[in-house]
Amino acid sequence: MLKIIIDFDDTLFPTSEKVIEVYNKRHNTKLDFAQITNYNLYDNFEVETADELIELFVEKCVYDSLQPYKGAVRTVKSLIEQGHEVYVATATDVRNMEWKEELLQKHFPFIPKKNLIRIHNKALLNADVMIEDKLDNLKSTFAERICFNQHWNIDDDADYVYSIFRTHHWGEINNIINEIERNNRQWKG
């Protein structure tokens, strides 16, 4: 049984895509999600635009119709059924925590409410496996690392140096977890 920490934004749910969508509707613009090539929004957009995008992360309208990534519900449910301990961690503003709790209960009712954790330094959670889109979080943990591929986390050197498994969709996660378990059993003898 593994203790698995899963990041909420842009790993379980495409939150940044939704933020861009809401921004474009409000301003009749055509910002492109693919423009986000750095985790820090200020490195991707003008200051005023980045400020507004960051504020959208705490607006309820972003979360009202947010859906999990394809395959996430089935995969997370399967991990729990296999006996793994699953937690969802988010480095979020307290103003949107309630909406994140509602989304988890709606789409992932099999994850206990107490397993949603608001924390900035996820490495403190002492996980066996961390599934995350932010490379800095993956680099700071001793857990097995699974990087949920996004435009802002492409770094082949980090993948190699930090032994990061990279996934492009939730359908690959079970196989990666199984490989991690096999490697752990072989290592322990």
PLM regions: where:
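Conserved Lys-Pro-Asp/Glu-containing loop-to-beta segment of HAD-superfamily phosphomonoesterases
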Residues: K114-F142
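Structural recognition of alpha->loop->beta junctions
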Residues: L103-I119, Y160-I177
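Short catalytic/ligand-binding loop motif for oxyanion handling, primarily in non-cytosolic enzymes
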Residues: F13-S16, E21, V86-V88, R95-W99, ...
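Active-site neighborhood of HAD-like aspartate-dependent phosphohydrolases
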Residues: M1-E52
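A structural signal for isolated positions on well-ordered beta-strands in alpha/beta enzyme cores
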Residues: E85-Y87, V129, I146
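Substrate-recognition element of Asp-dependent hydrolases with the DxDx(T/V) motif
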Residues: Y63-Q67, A72-L104
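Acidic, Mg2+-coordinating phosphoryl-transfer loop and its flanking beta/alpha structural elements
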Residues: I131-H168
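Metal-dependent phosphoesterase signature
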Residues: L31, N38-K77
